Amino acid sequence: RINGECCGALDQHLSANETALTKVKRNIDNWLIEGIDTIISAASGCGVMVKDYPKLFDKNDPYYSKAEEISNKTKDIAEFLVNEDLSQLSTPKVKLNYHAPCTLQHGQQLPGIVESILIKLGYDLPDVPDAHMCCGSAGTYSTLQPKISKQLRNEKLKNLDDDQFELILTSNIGCLLHLQNGTKTPVKHWIEIFEWL
């Protein structure tokens, strides 16, 4: 576990850019002082924010190269596990589906990575119609635009066939909470299945 604070994503979503930048700089400084080799993020929204740190600075800014160094050391937890041999793990037999969040498939450009791990673990995943579409959480969007956000959520849950599964998994904390507010089917972070092994 590394020292740091909020990645700054929520502040940035709310256009509190200076507050976000203060947090970003503090994180960069702390992590470089600690001499970290890798940052593994289980929250895809935080992961994409940290990977995008260089975009917050002009190339002439002294923080630009520091932000690039941190960005290059940041991996989603799926990137860490995708090449691991998981064949010896005994997975719980549960009928599940997976929601691929925008932050993982579009932001981090890692479409299908979690699905490939779940398939390796022995789960049959259906094709989700319009899987590329947002569930409506979108950072602070669900709070600032609740009506449209709920419409997007309801469409996503319909496409996930939420009432046909025992469990819905995702990689994004905001998506998890947002989807859970619209269904009785438990919604969990996909990495939680490893607790049951």
Language-model regions, residue ranges each:
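Iron-sulfur cluster-binding electron-transfer modules in prokaryotic oxidoreductases
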Residues: R1-L197
